[in-house]
From Swiss-Prot:
HAMAP family linked: GrpE
GO terms, biological process: protein folding
Protein name in UniProt: Protein GrpE
Subunit-level organization: Homodimer.
Gene that this polypeptide is encoded by: grpE
Protein keywords: Chaperone, Cytoplasm, Stress response
Subcellular location: Cytoplasm
Amino acid sequence: MSEDTNKNENVDNIPDNFDDNVSFTKLNEDVKDELALAKESLMRATADFENIKKRLEREKGEAVKFANESFARDLLPVIDALEIASNLQSGDDEIANKIKDGINLTIEQFKKCFEKYGIKEIRTDAEFNPEFHNAINYIESDEVESGKIAAVYQKGYLYNDRVLRPSMVVIAK
């Protein structure tokens, strides 16, 4: 009989608010679903943050890489003037020849400095390329193949592989 008594006690132990336990289970499932959504939202926000961080680092690197671009562009007329002075005919005048030698040394120093900071002269010994060359005229030529650069009026330069100034050229027909 003691077994029957235990069974009756277990039945008596079922709470009157058994339906509340069922609703608690439902509430627990709802909370778990909301937690899963919150975790997913956090993961997306974290991924977005990481992407923004990477983009800002990339943009910062680009800004640093091209920070001196306007300064470099401002130096181009200086080297142009020096090259024009270097090409002037000085004849047999010893002083003029020494000045010309000094100008040539200055040009070489400029070119070394340019190279050090990623400034390169645009090649003009090949076919015309509108990405790097600006055609200012066309001429008939038996010496130069059609579509090739026949003459250079102004040198062009690249800064870290970006066009700083296009070459001003004449194209052969």
